[in-house]
Amino acid sequence: NPSLSQHREKEIIDLIKRKKEQIEQINYSIKKGHFKRAKNVNFYVMNSLEVDIRPDGSLALPEKALSLLDFLIVSIHTQFNLSQEKMTQRILRGLEHPKAKILGHPTGRLLNQREGYELNWEKLFSFCQKNNKMLEVNAYPNRLDLPDFLIREAVKRKIKLAINTDSHALEQMEFIKYGVATARRGWAQKEDIINTQGVGEIKKILLN
């Protein structure tokens, strides 16, 4: 994903504009039946990115770039050692952006490598409930994040979950099975998982 640490603001906006145009062309072609494999299939491509939440809670892309996207997954990738209060404020501020719909790998843990950061889960769950924010079940084998005991708490509170593979290569899409298994251990049902819903319902949730 483009970031201000690697690209100038204009370069980022141009990259996302080109991506948006390409996705619009794909969706038009699907609608017109130009793709044989997509015929008779309700299929729609959304324009999204995973965006870093900076230590102050701001997002690591310029606002003009964010406005071109359909929705965001926001995540922590740096400075994991903040106090519980500061980390909680950081995440809640990141989630306040209207395009931010999903918190990615919410605990920040890496199995057998790194403990998760300190976070006030009661405040996060309450914020997600009030603002219709979702939590990711990251299926990458060294993450499995949200863990099952926190999935149970999210499900109790009717907070929607998104099972994502965090794929960086096509073959890693198979990791979805680990996310499904983790969600099941957390007693999640089909209705708790956004990406078990139909295209129309997913669009309604993510694009509003």
Model-derived features: where do they sit?
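Charged catalytic cores and adjacent phosphate/nucleic-acid-binding surfaces used
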Residues: 1-44, 55-208
